[in-house]
């Protein structure tokens, strides 16, 4: 019997909707089962618990980071970062995609809030292998 792997695809939503779709389609064409926020209603704390149950059933975790930090959970950490931390805690192999030219991201797809921009930068730094 052939093994089918499930991959959780994580990112902020509105600014990376097209990229998420492309990654999910590519994974599906390659024989993987993509899972991600498209399957879930709006984010809240119960949502995070549901997402964690989905991550528990996944074999891999992919995170894409653009110009936004994302919606904050109760502890003021983004849902995307919480998902990433959870995947790490479960020992899932993680593949992170960071925008190669963040300065070229259109203004409408970046955080205007300076506190969120700082959190995004710290999150990006933690995703890099030599960090």
Predicted regions and their residues:
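A general structural detector for well-ordered alpha-helical segments in enzyme core domains, enriched
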Residues: 23, 50-51, 80-83, 119, ...
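A short helix->loop->beta-strand "cap" motif at the edges of active sites that frequently abuts
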Residues: 89-102
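Conserved TIR/SEFIR loop-to-helix hotspot centered on a Trp-containing motif
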Residues: 42-47, 67-89
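Conserved N-terminal substructure of TIR/SEFIR domains
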Residues: 1-64, 88-90
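C-terminal interaction surface of TIR/SEFIR-family domains
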Residues: 102-131
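Extracytoplasmic/secreted cell-surface and envelope-processing proteins
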Residues: 18, 71-73, 105-107
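Solvent-exposed loop/turn segments at secondary-structure junctions
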Residues: 14, 41, 68-70, 101-104
């Amino acid at each position: 019997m052939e093994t089918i792997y499930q991959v959780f695809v994580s990112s902020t939503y509105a600014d990376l909707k097209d990229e998420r779709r492309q990654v999910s389609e590519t994974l599906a064409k390659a024989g993987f089962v993509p899972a991600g926020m498209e399957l879930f209603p709006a984010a809240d704390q119960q949502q995070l618990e549901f997402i964690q149950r989905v991550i528990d059933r996944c074999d891999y975790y992919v995170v894409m980071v653009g110009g936004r930090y994302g919606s904050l959970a109760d502890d003021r950490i983004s849902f995307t970062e919480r998902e990433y931390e959870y995947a790490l805690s479960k020992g899932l192999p993680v593949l992170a995609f960071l925008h190669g030219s963040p300065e070229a991201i259109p203004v409408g797809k970046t955080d205007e809030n300076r506190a969120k921009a700082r959190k995004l930068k710290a999150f990006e730094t933690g995703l890099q292998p030599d960090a």
